[in-house]
């Protein structure tokens, strides 16, 4: 998801999606440790999405205060 798409979401939606992404990252890491991960690129994609979500949360948090 692009940063522009993240910025269009509400704070609650961003927090929920971020939680889902962190759970998915955990699952991918477990699969990687077990040797069952097909593509390590998926880890990077999830990490980037989490970073984008956190960045937008911080931007919106600063604007509201």
Curated annotation (Swiss-Prot):
Please report a single Pfam family linked to this protein: Ribosomal_L29
List the SUPFAM superfamilies: Ribosomal protein L29 (L29p)
Q: Which InterPro entries match?
A: Ribosomal_protein_uL29 (IPR050063), Ribosomal_uL29 (IPR001854), Ribosomal_uL29_CS (IPR018254), Ribosomal_uL29_sf (IPR036049)
Q: Which PROSITE patterns did the record assign?
A: RIBOSOMAL_L29
The superkingdom listed in its UniProt entry is Bacteria
Q: What is this protein called?
A: Large ribosomal subunit protein uL29
| BP terms from Gene Ontology | translation
Instruction: Give the organism the record lists.
Output: Syntrophus aciditrophicus (strain SB)
Keyword terms of this UniProt record: Ribonucleoprotein, Ribosomal protein
Q: Which GO terms describe its cellular component?
A: cytosolic large ribosomal subunit
Q: Which PANTHER family does this entry report, sorted A to Z?
A: 60S RIBOSOMAL PROTEIN L35/50S RIBOSOMAL PROTEIN L29, LARGE RIBOSOMAL SUBUNIT PROTEIN UL29C
Q: Which family does it belong to?
A: Belongs to the universal ribosomal protein uL29 family.
Cite a single GO MF annotation.
structural constituent of ribosome
């Amino acid at each position: 998801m692009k940063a522009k798409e993240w910025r269009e979401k509400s704070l609650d939606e961003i927090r929920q999606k971020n939680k889902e992404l962190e759970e998915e990252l955990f699952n991918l890491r477990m699969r990687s440790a077990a040797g069952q991960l097909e593509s390590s690129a998926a880890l990077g994609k999830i990490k980037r999405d989490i970073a984008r979500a956190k960045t937008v949360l911080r931007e919106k948090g600063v604007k509201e205060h």
